[in-house]
Amino acid sequence: MADEYCLTNFIDFSLSLSLPLKHNRIKYTCFDISDSYIIFGASSGSLYLFNRNGKFLHLIPNKHGAITNLSISANNKYVAFSTQRSLICVYVVNLSAQATPQVIVTHLDQSVQVSCIHWTQDEKQFYYGDSRGQVNLVLLSSFIGHSLLLNMTVHPLLYLDSPIVQIDDFESLLLVSNCTKCILCNTEYEEYKQIGNRPRDGAYGACFFISPHESVQPSRIYCARPGTRIWEVDFEGEVIQTHQFKTALATAPAKIQKTTNVDNNADELDSNDELLDYQPQQLQFSRVQRLSHDFLLAYTELGLYIFDVRNSSVVLWCNQFERILDCRVSGMEIFVFTQTGSLYSVQLQTLHGYSITLMHQSKLLQCANLLRQHVKYFADKARENYELKLLNQLKQLLIERQEYELLNDISVIFDAIAQCTGTALDTQSSGGSSAATERSGSMRAIGVSTTKGPPKGVYVLENAFCDNLKQQPKSGHFKDALLTVTGKFGKNIIKYKFNIFAEEQQQLVRELIPASERSLPFKDIKARYESGDVGEEEIVSRCKRPTPQAPHISPEEKTIYNLYLICKSAKFSRTHCVERYRAVFDEYAASELIALMGKLAQLMVEHGDGQEQAERNCYEMYFNYLNPELIWEVDDSTRDYIASGFVLLNAPQCMEIVRCDHCAFPLRFDNACQYHELGAVLLRYFWSRNEQLKCFDVVQAVPALLDVLAKFYLAEQNLDKVIPIVLNYGQPELLLDVGRQLNVSAWARCFEQFAELQRGRLICVNCECVSSVEQDQLTRHFFYTWNCFLNIALDHLTASDTLSLIFKWSSYIPNDAIDREFYSRCLIKG
């Protein structure tokens, strides 16, 4: 039968913790535990070190502000902590009274607060997440063979869209949970994915659940979800099932079994609890963590919750702690830190194990009351656990104390013990029983199962690492999202930066690369940790299984496949990822690279992209890689390819263009432009070769390059072209730049055309004819005002010249168009 559990060994550390505090104003703010220490951070900024029994050991002063988070490294050598002043600090644990505490500090952005810290198994690195949604890796450096730290470096890894809630890691896998989603990263393979596709809003934790027997129970990831639900996820990032504990928690809370004098009213209170009507609980778990090998611990401000996620059941929940702030786990021991600064610990123990402990401690009456509270459990357990015969000692005690009512209540347990011990004696004395035992043993040896099926409500999980059992995902519902990781550690150092703000996952195709050519990094990591003889034999047998003959793929096809994956990753992460394919592009000549881009575009079309979108994707990859100055060196066909791509990428920005009535040249337009520097170099090349027609072809398609054309005309002192371009372009920065080289007469012409422009009459740069446009078309992108225009003019003219031009064109200037500040500037300038 399934075991039942209770919380025992209650310890209150409050008295021990209060001794080192010399002032009532100093409060503990956070804590962490290890095998050797309990360490607290305080509002004073200091660290307080205790041993596991609560004895005070050491005080580490700190003047960098109140401590908000802290974490102890796996080997107990270092303590990483953060402060309210946006600092990350690392303390080298040294309990020597003569040694000066060594603390190294790094400053963060003042607007950012660290939300969680997590050490890896490597003593020289840890992660931290902040309120901005950024995850960083901190690497420590020290003298070889010494614990003396030299420096620590911070490397950004992830930029998410909300504060980080919890971080966990397993080997090269990194699990990050923020307020909207969970991200699973494989830092070794530079891949990561979002777990599930349903966003959430709130602080929900996630953790790894590593199995010691991989072949029996595969390792999993568990992610808290709204509504007291928990996702069970495999190491491929796929949600296997959802555990719903909302209704299962409509039960009485567990009482902490305190080894004190027996309360005569305890039984009455427990019976009253059973009569109460407990409602389903809608809970939010901001942190989940593994408890021992089998259970998952979660907590809220009002209670502890322990789940058996393997069997989808509630072990127990307890509401005897008030205002819980944080919890930590060590083996089966749970440490609870409250908002009042108190620390308590309890231990999770089976009921029958606790009863035997009470017997060994000679607390017989307390043990008898425990049996009365759980009569059915102990009666069933006594029939299969021979060790419980120790409880027979209670019978004599109850008779001696004349506790006949209590003896009668638990008599069924003694009957079960007698039945168990009698069966054991019969088994030892009966040859037939021996033969039966032998037969049953042989049946177990050949794999015949005599157990019943799983009880109702228990999930039977499939082995995610057995390919012949796992259902193959359909291509139409594949949710993997491979992204480029900006930083790596261990074998590779941090290389790239990236940004994730994906609100929904993009569809990728798993069959891009055949199975024989494709690595499955998330499964490979799990396979390395399969332990035991059964697991090893399974791996060997898989290796011997004949693999199907994979189709041959040429190196060029592999390159195209890789480029396709990089492109899709870049779209999802909103980064260029140019460093990932720069080395590939460097191996090709210009003409060969153009041909490769054509094949890549064709592959994108085959996998669902439109022809134009595929070409745009290829052009973006090429332009992100291309150095614009290389336009001077490439051949004409490559240059034409670049010009065509530049026009294609900027086509959407050119949809709303007001054109000349006479020659259709752009008059008003949106001056936003992609790869403006590339277009500027392209125009300079054409202009230097006297290929003005090609310049005008590009500018007519992408009028945002007219600012480059204005500078060409300005160098030739062709003001008839410069002034219309500057005024039609509608960018104050261009007027500021060009205005430095205009004299008074040129500014007079500029005033004249600006007045005409305010009347809706625009001069074409190409044919120099005047076109009339509607007022709404004029103001759609136009942001010059008389006040802005005159202030720019005053920067380059004297006050008297500016005022005389204003007087000349005063009939065209509205009364309220000029601010008082302008006239004040004129007076100051003289």
Swiss-Prot record:
One of its GO terms (cellular component) is cytoplasm. The keyword Disulfide bond does not apply. Keywords: Pigment, Repeat, Sensory transduction, Vision, WD repeat. Pfam families: Beta-prop_HPS5, TPR_HPS5_insect. GO terms for biological process: eye pigment biosynthetic process; protein targeting to lysosome; visual perception. InterPro entries: Beta-prop_HPS5-like (IPR056499), HPS5 (IPR035431), TPR_HPS5_insects (IPR056446), WD40/YVTN_repeat-like_dom_sf (IPR015943). WD repeats lie at residues 62-101, 109-148. One of its GO terms (molecular function) is pigment binding. Has a role in the biogenesis of eye pigment granules. Eye pigment granules are specialized forms of late endosomes or lysosomes. Biogenesis of pigment granules in the eye requires molecular components required for protein delivery to lysosomes. Belongs to the HPS5 family. This is BLOC-2 complex member HPS5 homolog.
